[in-house]
Amino acid sequence: LYAALTMLLAPISYGNLQFRISEALCVLPVFFPYTSVGLFLGCALANMISAAGILDVIFGSLATLGAGLCAAACGREARRTGAMPSTAKRVLACLSPVVWNGIVIGAVLAWSFARDAFWQSFLLFGAEVALGEAGVLFLLGMPLISLIPRIFHLERKNAA
């Protein structure tokens, strides 16, 4: 699903100003930790057509895996108790792809396209990627965290 969404929406999914809708799926590990691996593989597949080449395939996929594992950690207590994750945990789960991709993809793009001005490009590209990630995660990912328990009929207890 990640790869299909990314490739289907390719014009907005690649580059320094990207709005990769598939990144909203990075909240799935909050409830289903094993989906981190699927996100990693989907990202690797999607990044095979990236202009940044093999660096994006390797490091972009690892960034998505890192973000997924962080999201899974944010949901650990909620999965154990059956309650919805706290607001703070939901925000952290959404911030994790923003941070991972801002740093990693910012570096990949700077290295791939502006090596002579790496640090300046890294800061600019990283900020642009993080901004797009934040848009996707907070506009789509945050509501998805609220919808997943209803969609999958997960047992919910009142959070204290």
Please report, for each region that a protein language model flagged, where it lies by residue.
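Membrane-embedded alpha-helical hairpins and interfacial helices in multi-pass inner-membrane proteins
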Residues: 10-16, 24, 45-62, 66, ...
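Hydrophobic transmembrane alpha-helices
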Residues: 1-37
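Small-polar-interrupted transmembrane alpha-helices in polytopic inner-membrane proteins
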Residues: 2, 39-47
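A generic, lipid-embedded transmembrane alpha helix
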Residues: 31-42, 101-106
